[in-house]
Amino acid sequence: MSVVDIPELTYEGRVLDMDQVGLLRRSDDALHDRDELHRRMGEDGYLYLPGLLNRDQVIDARGELCDRLHRAGMLDYSRPVMECVAAPQAQIDAAAIGPFMPELARDNASLHSVIYDGPMIDFYTFFLGGSVRHFDYTWFRAKQPGTTTATTPHHDFVYMGRGTPDLYTSWTPFSDVPFAMGGLMMLEKSHTHEDIVQGCGQTDVDLYCTNRGNAQEVVAAAQTSGRELTGEERQQIDWNSTGAYSSDAIATREELGGRWLLDEYRMGDVLVFSMHIMHAS
């Protein structure tokens, strides 16, 4: 596929400048060359690895995810469950759900076998040259369609940076994602903007104002119950930051330069990226 094959894309209903959109560089040709993988990670800020995972395993995990979404009332009951067609927006309380659904990953053996075992861990063991550890928490997005549900530009260090900085995100689609569905896009060379990396890139989104309202009580109650905050609870808290660099991917590209890079993704693909590359959807 060439850049000319990418259809006109939009962000929140507005057309992207297609002269500033490109394809991700594939790195499946360098899977067994550690030095080259590190060179590309340094140069690009990401490693796009189509077909790294066992597609049948990913499809099996998708089945469990679809069942959970169906039971949660998130799917259109008139369609086959495995199609994973979202329910009408009026039926879904997006504010209560929030941007992530960690319950989809909790105690999910088929999902964990994909993201925390097998080819995924084999890749990281080779890439990093030793044993690796994953987070206990899984950032699982269940994206709804529409012009108001786009993921805003951000980098991941603000969510994960309290411990070691030696971290990588493994974006793993559990659906085939044609361009029309709006898959992940990376802002070219954005990880090289040191002013941003050392500035807003050091924000900690888990900090909140402790002397306003009942924030401490809300957080303590969730911790005591061993659960995540609900979307409604999160709205009661005055957070240090939302984590977003901006609310506008088009304006962010115009400010920082570079192209938005993406591809059509298939189940089995993985996009590995560093903590400081800007991305959105």
Range-by-range predicted roles:
Residues 2-44, 50-153, 159-161:
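Non-heme Fe(II)-dependent double-stranded beta-helix
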Residues 127-128, 160-179, 240, 264-267, ...:
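Short, conserved beta-strand element in jelly-roll/cupin
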Residues 139, 155-157, 172-176, 188:
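Short, structured patches in soluble enzyme cores that scaffold and shape functional sites
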